[in-house]
Amino acid sequence: MIKYLIVGLGNIGPEYHETRHNIGFMTVEALARINNAPPFIDGRYGFTTSFSIKGRQLILLKPSTFMNLSGLAVRYWMQKENIPLENVLIVVDDLALPFGTLRLKGKGSDAGHNGLKHIAAILGTQNYARLRFGIGNDFPKGGQIDYVLGHFTDEDRKTMDERLETAGEIIKSFCLAGIDITMNQFNKK
């Protein structure tokens, strides 16, 4: 069975639950729920669960290292499960995209995101797939930290379930059809 590591970035703790910065956690939680995966288990460097589709095992990870040390969890679980870099997908919040916009990329810069920055530093490369989930940037100058650690608006919540489902479709397509086909299919939406 071919293994994939799907990492939703976020911060642990009730104060961060369902904040914009935790959209990665929310995405893998929704993917697990929709696919009837068992509950997440507290393991080394994170909480994991898995499910299989068409000969592929998707291992879902919510790092418990806090955002800025996410690379430790990614490296550990890649090594533990013997997963090659091309089978790793990081789900991350993105301030530069309007809320709900989803963009799959095969590589790229960290765009100022400390979780991605640490992953690149630990893995020694920026050449890993990431699914950027737009959280918008409707905040006053100097208000970025409060914004990303804030909760979604009622307006955002209206489309949240649909956007999380679409993110799950993108993740499954990444595992089944590959990144190029998936980017062509979904990045236009």
Swiss-Prot record:
Site (Stabilizes the basic form of H active site to accept a proton): D93
Catalytic activity entry: an N-acyl-L-alpha-aminoacyl-tRNA + H2O = an N-acyl-L-amino acid + a tRNA + H(+)
A Pfam family matched in the record: Pept_tRNA_hydro
Gene Ontology MF terms in the entry: peptidyl-tRNA hydrolase activity; tRNA binding
Active site: H21 (proton acceptor)
GO terms of biological process kind: protein quality control for misfolded or incompletely synthesized proteins; rescue of stalled ribosome
Sites marked Discriminates between blocked and unblocked aminoacyl-tRNA: N11
GO CC term (a single one): cytoplasm
Enzyme class: hydrolase
Keyword terms: Cytoplasm, Hydrolase, RNA-binding, tRNA-binding
Binding site for tRNA: Y16, F66, N68, N114
NCBIfam families xrefs: pth (TIGR00447)
Described function: Hydrolyzes ribosome-free peptidyl-tRNAs (with 1 or more amino acids incorporated), which drop off the ribosome during protein synthesis, or as a result of ribosome stalling. Catalyzes the release of premature peptidyl moieties from peptidyl-tRNA molecules trapped in stalled 50S ribosomal subunits, and thus maintains levels of free tRNAs and 50S ribosomes.
Quaternary context: Monomer.
Family statement: Belongs to the PTH family.
The protein's name: Peptidyl-tRNA hydrolase
